[in-house]
From Swiss-Prot:
UniProt function note: Functions in the N-end rule pathway of protein degradation where it conjugates Leu from its aminoacyl-tRNA to the N-termini of proteins containing an N-terminal aspartate or glutamate.
Similarity comment: family membership: Belongs to the R-transferase family. Bpt subfamily.
Organism expressing this protein natively: Vibrio parahaemolyticus serotype O3:K6 (strain RIMD 2210633)
An MF annotation (GO) of this entry: arginyl-tRNA--protein transferase activity
Lineage: Bacteria, Pseudomonadati, Pseudomonadota, Gammaproteobacteria, Vibrionales
EC number(s) reported in the record: 2.3.2.29
A single cellular component GO annotation: cytoplasm
This protein's name: Aspartate/glutamate leucyltransferase
Highest taxon listed in the record's lineage: Bacteria
Length: 233
């Protein structure tokens, strides 16, 4: 870990059922020091595998499992794949816009997404206040990437933490029955935002190879994974 973070206080949660891999137990390490709640410190913490949920900064610390690997895209080295080029071509009629607040109709879209895609997950049933506590924080700049169609219909929202050297794709929800891959498209738009702002990295959270729903993250080149506290890729 970075020498600036050698002496932070860490608390461990109890083991509980894993949200992603059935029949496995999950445990997380939580950074306890409130002074870590700054943009500069959070950039260092993300580079060392941490992530946030609301104001809580954590990283997986499971006893018998190391499936969660932090993953990030190197923005200067990013290269579109053929399938991503095709997706952008099909999405020419769509547009994206970064905003400081979500549009008024966000919760209806979020509810459709959760009820269709994650009915067995921890965020079901969808609750407005619960999502707001999960997504927002008081010590980071959090922006909301909105995706619209040609009739200005809201198709997706990508919650994005924005910092000086990097951004973090925090959470994305979208129209579940739309015929294009809106989740992938949201990441491509976030990459575009990072390029426009001369950022180095876009963090995508954790990659779990055994979880098929996450494997889209590995299709972004050039990505890196944090393995044994070293970024590789």
């Amino acid at each position: 870990m970075s020498t600036d973070l050698q002496h932070i206080r860490i608390g461990l949660t109890n083991n509980h059922p894993c949200s992603y891999l059935p029949e496995r137990q999950e445990r997380v390490a939580v950074a306890l020091d409130a002074e870590l709640h700054t943009e500069q410190n959070y950039q260092l913490l993300m580079a060392n595998g941490f992530r946030r949920s609301g104001d809580t900064i954590y990283k997986p610390h499971c006893e018998r499992c190391h499936a969660c690997q932090p993953i990030r895209i190197s923005i200067p080295d990013f290269v579109l794949s053929r399938s991503q080029k095709r997706l952008l071509s099909k999405a020419k009629s769509l547009r994206w816009e970064m905003k400081t607040e979500m549009d008024a109709e966000w919760f209806e879209l979020y509810s459709r997404y959760i009820c269709k895609r994650h009915k067995n997950g921890t965020m079901y049933p969808p609750k407005r206040d619960e999502f707001s506590r999960f997504a927002q924080t008081t010590w980071l700049t959090t922006l909301f990437l909105h995706i619209y169609d040609e009739s200005n219909q809201l198709l997706g929202v990508a919650v994005t933490d924005v910092m000086a050297q990097c951004s973090s794709a925090f959470y994305t929800f979208f129209e579940p029955d739309y015929p294009l891959s809106l989740g992938t498209l949201a990441v491509l738009y976030q990459v575009n935002y990072c390029q426009q702002n001369n950022e180095q990295w876009l963090y995508l959270g954790y990659q779990i190879d055994e979880c098929p729903a996450m494997n889209y993250k590995t299709r972004f080149q050039r990505h890196q994974r944090l393995v044994n506290q070293r970024w590789q890729g």
